[in-house]
Amino acid sequence: RALLDEFPNVAIMRTFSKAYGLANYRVGYMMTPLELANYMQTIRLPYNLNTLSQVAAEAAFDDQEFLARTVSQNAEERTKWESLFDELGIHYYKSEANFIFFASPDAEGLADAWLKSGYQVRRGQREGWLRLTIPMPQDGDIMRKILRDFMN
């Protein structure tokens, strides 16, 4: 909130895609000074949010217990990945998000190994690097085993 009071050109945006589990609904919100919000209203598309998405977002926003569990689970799983990367000497960028960006000597080979088991990671953002979206714990266990096997 302090940033919004201090800077008239700041917009803070949040998505419901990740922690709220509403990726297909394409819904989020923005906090910004009134003048910028009024301008955004003039350029947004009409009917940019359908009723189903709005109802789902409102229900998700009301379920703060679910959000807290999701954020906690994500943090625990991210810590497991960071520990494994440290153990294997894999360079990565620390993250508070639901993904980790990391280097691999054979990024394409590793991505293919995961893909053969049904897991996709984001490729091509930087040569030799992959972006791993933090998976559910049971999938994370399988993916970490694949990574260990791949690195040995």
Positions of the model-derived regions?
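Glycine-enriched alpha-helix->loop->beta-strand junction motifs that scaffold or abut catalytic
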Residues: 7-10, 118
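Short, glycine/charged-enriched secondary-structure capping and boundary segments
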Residues: 1-2, 26-28, 147
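PLP-dependent aminotransferase class I/II
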Residues: 9-85, 90-93
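Conserved core of the PLP fold type I
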Residues: 1-6, 57
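Short amphipathic alpha-helical segments
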Residues: 25, 96-98, 128-130
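Short loop segments at secondary-structure junctions
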Residues: 32-36, 104-107, 137
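Conserved PLP-binding catalytic core of the aspartate aminotransferase-like
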Residues: 74-75, 83-117, 134
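PLP-dependent enzyme catalytic core of the Aspartate aminotransferase-like
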Residues: 108, 113-117, 122-152
